[in-house]
Amino acid sequence: MIPARDTIAAVATAPGRGGVGIVRVSGPRARAIAITLSGREPTPRHAHYGPFHADDGEVIDEGLLLFFPGPHSFTGEDVLELHGHGGPVVLDMLLQRCVDLGVRLARPGEFSERAFLNDKLDLAQAEAIADLIEASSAQAARNAVRSLQGEFSRRVHQLTERLIQLRIYVEAAIDFPEEEIDFLADGHVLAQLDGVRTELSTVLREAGQGALLRDGMTVVIAGRPNAGKSSLLNALAGREAAIVTDIAGTTRDVLREHILIDGMPLHVVDTAGLRDTEDQVERIGVQRALSAIGEADRILLVVDASAPEASDPSALWPEFLDFSPEPGKVTLIRNKADLTGEAIVLRCDNDGQATLSLCARSGEGLELLREHLKHCMGYEQTAESSFSARRRHLDALRLADEHLRHGHDQLTLAGAGELLAEDLRLAQQALGEITGAFSSDDLLGRIFSSFCIGK
């Protein structure tokens, strides 16, 4: 356990009023503070009900006091929890009393950071705490719990252990070249390397599903005024989220709705109609729409199928493609298909341009759109996803896979054992970034600073 230099405290419950509020303390002064506030020696891991006293003996609040001696606590240090009434004033008084007794206010994520530094959990498990708090669906919450319990870390450790054993074998073959047997050419190394790559591919696929359930994707609905953009937003949201009228330019700002499609979070953004206008407010709305288009994972370009104008995105709005750097991210939505009598169908041309005919008002074609959005993000409802993952985890897994692929080429094409050994080392280092075995202080600072205060 890393010795703590000071004692920290923070409110561990969400801001606002509630039935119960918790002040958490961690560090070497936790036990002394428990005695001072309650007037008695706390029994480890037992709940004590009683008053919490101010310096002059006045009762600040009454509630439960729990003391967890280190190293058998969340942070690995002595931890004190004060469970009082959930009013912000009362909690602030309790927190200030702790500060007066020699503690300092905790930074965001500092409790979890101390748990990580004291080997109570690894980096992936620490991130799972934040993922569980922020989960937007039941499946995402279940995945976060599995990661918190170590499922993701266990898979990464298994891969790392296989890499270590393979490195030992390869480096031994390099260090003893006088042996008559060419250990690099006997097929054992190649078989083991292929096995690790196969397992890594499986973990990467599951991590991709976990990341989708955690982050979802951002879908921007864009198009000319009166094309039916707001009607499409309402249809996807299942409620009247946006005002719908026959007046062009009704939507002048960006509207956001968060929905779920088979457990996958979808962040839908409705935008102002794209057109040249002299109205200053509407012009600002168009600029915000173009900004949202540039940041989208997927763009639904809505056109009025009953209008005679072209369905080519560049013809509908000349600047559109300038703000959408990847044309492949655009799905053309031919809305009001009920007026044209065209089939409700999804088509893809030779250039990969997807076009979907639907009717937002009646809901015809919406299920096709939902399936299309899941397909665009590679989400499979039936695919196994047993843990939560973040984009940095995917980047690390892909980097490890790239090193293993390169190492495979070095072995099979050049027989270069030294270069293979280096690629194995780099792959192991990439995996270590996930659990924190190889992590810079800058990375740790960025991760834990995004946590809630008190976590």
Curated annotation (Swiss-Prot):
Tagged with keyword Transmembrane helix: no
Annotated residues for binding of (6S)-5-formyl-5,6,7,8-tetrahydrofolate: 24, 81, 120, 455
Entry binding sites for K(+): 226, 245, 247, 250
Main location: cytoplasm
EC number from the UniProt entry: 3.6.-.-
GO BP term (any one): tRNA methylation
Compartments where found: Cytoplasm
Binding site for GTP: 226-231, 245-251, 270-273, 335-338
UniProt xrefs under Gene3D superfamilies: P-loop containing nucleotide triphosphate hydrolases, Probable tRNA modification gtpase trme, domain 1, tRNA modification GTPase MnmE domain 2
GO CC terms of this entry: cytosol
TrmE-type G domain span: 216-378
Sorted UniProt keywords: Cytoplasm, GTP-binding, Hydrolase, Magnesium, Metal-binding, Nucleotide-binding, Potassium, tRNA processing
GO MF annotations, alphabetized: GTP binding; GTPase activity; metal ion binding
Cofactor: K(+)
Binding residues for Mg(2+): 230, 251
Segments forming a coiled coil: none
Complex and partners: Homodimer. Heterotetramer of two MnmE and two MnmG subunits.
Listed PANTHER family: TRNA MODIFICATION GTPASE GTPBP3 (PTHR42714), TRNA MODIFICATION GTPASE GTPBP3, MITOCHONDRIAL (PTHR42714:SF2)
Family: Belongs to the TRAFAC class TrmE-Era-EngA-EngB-Septin-like GTPase superfamily. TrmE GTPase family.
Protein's job: Exhibits a very high intrinsic GTPase hydrolysis rate. Involved in the addition of a carboxymethylaminomethyl (cmnm) group at the wobble position (U34) of certain tRNAs, forming tRNA-cmnm(5)s(2)U34.
Protein name per its UniProtKB record: tRNA modification GTPase MnmE
Species this chain originates from: Stutzerimonas stutzeri (strain A1501) (Pseudomonas stutzeri)
Taxonomic classification: Bacteria, Pseudomonadati, Pseudomonadota, Gammaproteobacteria, Pseudomonadales
